[in-house]
């Protein structure tokens, strides 16, 4: 995703300058990595202040899943119908767009799929007095089912705007309702900003801000590197520490 255009002179110059100084992977720290991570974290509300740098959106969502499962010591995830989060095996399991598509084998028992919050063709439409809350309660129903299962509830992952689902803007109160229920049950809330982050929604820098919520984990990709292999996961110190230990 060439977020600021192909061959943008500032991007080209920054890349040229850095390749002339140092070219290494993110396993080894150097000042530019730290400086970038600090600037990136500065764009998020507290307590989102820990940054993990990776190479692709799939890696970011894979790491987010591992963080949630490590923190909660549970495996189960609630996902949104037609959602897409990546192409690794575990992410295909979380992506109805893939596992319910051609050649797909459906979701495993540890994954529950909640209806897409579509006000045009969905279960609850614009005529409903509060469709966002109604859809959010559906998320909670699936979360309760997981919490009472052998898998347990690790969390809920949702794109801040449903991309492959048809560029569906989430209805008001959807994430507020869903997040409150997920957290009450001990799960974590993951905002997938891989496709829509970095100001692509217009009004705000991050899509989740349109819903007036603060996720526990945010994943970034595509526009972050303007087409170059860069992605990130932003989370809290508490969640990061649980993963490190």
Residues covered by each model-derived region:
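Conserved N-terminal phosphate-binding loop of PLP-dependent enzymes in the Aspartate aminotransferase
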Residues: 1-245
